[in-house]
Amino acid sequence: MSLFTIGDLHLCLGAPDKTMSVFTGWQNYQERLEKNWLENVTEDDTIVLAGDISWGMSLQQAAPDFHFIEKLPGQKIILKGNHDYWWTTLKKMEGFLADEGCSSIKILHNNHYQYGDYGICGTRGWVNMPGEVQDEKVLRREVQRLETSIQSAVKAGLEPIVFMHYPPIFATNFNYDILEILYRYKIKDCYYGHVHGRSAHELCVTNTYDDVNFHLIAGDYLQFIPQKVI
């Protein structure tokens, strides 16, 4: 039994015009993902999908992508990315997944999931650069969601592992509000996606910074091979 993760699947079975195959490093990405998933992940495993899961604009349009994920082995825990336009209220999403028979997909949102002695925690996050007032409102909300998730794991006596969509650090841009939460709760590992392309990957923190181990898990960076966490 193992824990895996990968971000940015960008599935488009319900919106084929949104395929990422036109970009360098993304050729046949859905087929490669399926092959690598089947070779590495078993039914006894859990895998965290760190946002940008489907290009569907609604739950209905994203349904083929959920069914694709459902058929793959393992328990799946999903969190929101900036391109998950289908995302709606937790009640609606859980009801939709239940109606579609997607029983292996769980949603990480203001909560945690236990994995052994660990708590799987996380949220989408937000951009690192100073923005408009609206950006500040979104950032404050994301900071609260991250802390709520981590606190729920700590209260359960678990060691939190954090998964996010946006990177807390990118190039010379630091999201100090997010980092403060990671430092306060002494988070050892933070996994994130969002960043695409070799030149951008080179600007990411992929080592230990201020006692936090940062891991880039964007699909193209991992060559669509799920990364083992535990």
Model regions: which residues?
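Short, Lys/Arg-enriched, disordered terminal segments
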Residues: 1-3, 229-230
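Core catalytic region of metal-dependent phosphoesterases/phosphodiesterases
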Residues: 2, 15-115, 176-186, 210-218
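Structural motif
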Residues: 3, 46, 118-119, 159-161, ...
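Active-site metal-binding loops of divalent metal-dependent hydrolases
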Residues: 7-11, 51-54, 82-84, 111, ...
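Conserved catalytic scaffold of divalent metal-dependent phosphoesterases
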Residues: 9-14, 40, 88-174, 181
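Conserved beta-sheet core of the metallophosphoesterase superfamily
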Residues: 77, 168-230
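Short secondary-structure transition/capping segments
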Residues: 81, 91-99, 125-133, 194-213
